């Protein structure tokens, strides 16, 4: 207390205040990751392991589970290939070209992220279902889209297409066109320029987009549930198997398959991030 009788509150130095604020932000981030990411994963892992190794092995050997993993793999592979090709093309158009409607195209790219997957599935039903816009043509040619693999692939591609685009566009904007113009000046064709210059510059963005696409494709359930019919042993993906397992109170097999899917996605993302950081360190040295 001062001589005048006023109570003075001690003021922390600015550096100390910054450290406290910084530490608080770190604590909040760790709490967020721990509660919303790590804790659920630990819970699933604990539930799966608690079922016993015999249950884990027997679950992973079930024909329905094996077919579900196979179908998930097929959908994921096709989705990755298609979204990578068209994603890079769209990213090049958005990053390099100037035309009327470019802003609208850039906004529409994010539409699959804003629309519920269930709505995406219903859109597919409107287009390819009984009485749908395109159903008569496909039916007349003996092609089945709805409640079959094609519709499952289509909705998954629609949902996953933004990931490659949004990872590649910033990279293209950052690197610019100087190297590409230099390659053309030296006589390189458009294809040579793309494969030797452009693709080399965007490879890490593309790989990370592919990793996100893979993880999203593996975990997709809403749209696939609508268009697949969830026929066991035919149109049931791994995530749909998990849903059916819990609906039928078969919790242990559901936890085992769920943990397997989670581990695949986590390992893939960690590997991509590790290689990316190693490459960045090599470039700096």
Language-model-derived ranges and their functions:
Residues 9-15, 53-61, 66, 101, ...:
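Membrane-interfacial helix termini and adjacent extracytoplasmic/periplasmic loops
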Residues 35, 70, 74-86, 90, ...:
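Hydrophobic alpha-helical transmembrane segments of multipass integral membrane proteins
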Residues 114-121:
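Transmembrane alpha-helices and adjacent helix-loop boundaries
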């Amino acid at each position: 207390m001062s001589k005048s009788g006023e109570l003075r509150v001690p003021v922390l130095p600015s550096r100390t205040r910054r450290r406290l604020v910084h530490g608080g932000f770190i604590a909040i981030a760790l709490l967020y990751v721990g509660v919303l990411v790590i804790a659920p994963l630990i819970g699933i892992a604990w539930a799966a392991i608690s079922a016993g190794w015999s249950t884990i092995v027997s679950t992973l050997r079930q024909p329905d589970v094996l077919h579900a993993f196979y179908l998930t793999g097929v959908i994921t592979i096709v989705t990755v290939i298609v979204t990578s090709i068209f994603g890079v093309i769209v990213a090049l158009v958005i990053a390099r070209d100037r035309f009327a409607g470019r802003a609208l195209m850039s906004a529409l790219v994010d539409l699959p992220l804003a629309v519920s997957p269930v709505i995406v599935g219903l859109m597919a039903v409107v287009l390819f279902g009984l009485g749908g816009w395109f159903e008569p043509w496909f039916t007349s040619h003996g092609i089945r889209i709805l409640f079959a693999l094609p519709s499952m692939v289509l909705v998954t591609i629609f949902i996953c297409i933004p990931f490659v685009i949004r990872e590649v566009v910033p990279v293209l904007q950052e690197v610019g066109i100087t190297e590409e113009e230099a390659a053309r000046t030296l006589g390189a064709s458009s294809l040579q320029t793309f494969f030797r210059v452009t693709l080399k510059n965007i490879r890490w963005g593309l790989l990370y987009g592919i990793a996100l696409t893979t993880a999203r494709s593996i975990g997709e359930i809403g749209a696939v549930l609508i268009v697949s019919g969830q026929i066991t042993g035919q149109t049931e993906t791994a995530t749909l198997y998990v849903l059916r397992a819990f609906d039928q109170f078969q919790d242990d097999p559901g936890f085992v398959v769920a943990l397997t899917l989670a581990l695949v996605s986590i390992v893939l993302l960690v590997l991509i991030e590790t290689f990316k950081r190693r490459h960045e360190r090599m470039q700096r040295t």
